[in-house]
Amino acid sequence: SGISVIRVGAATEIEMIEKRHRIEDALEAVKSAQAEGVLPGGGSFLVQKSANMLEFLADKVENETQELGVKIIQGAVKEPLKQMCLNAGESPDIIVHDVGLQEKNFGYDFSEHKMVDLLERGVIDPARVTRCALQNSVSVAGTLITSNFAIVEV
């Protein structure tokens, strides 16, 4: 019938709210995956695609400023994987380089310290989430570049 009920228990109201939010996030991730599919997770998809991003966008890049923008994005999309490396005590430069050379769907498994097929292992990201994150970050960067200033909280 397409309907399910998830019952969750918790010792405190705060714990129950936290669990409810986690379930809602998981449900939204499943809906996103159903709508637009999944990508290999762990930051590997964007790292692998960044290598030929300038070639792919060659017909859309009209000047040096736009080319610089693409190069900035090429570097920025590697940051999530670099941060995961740092969190795991691994060398970001080596792993990011190696992930960039891997076949489709492959990435680094931090628990086993080796390259694996991420889709096979269930390490996935909803394509919609990745697309929206990239679009939103480019939009914010564009706004900052064109406004020439920003007020930030440190």
Describe each PLM feature range.
Residues 2-154:
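Extended, low-charge hydrophobic alpha-helical regions
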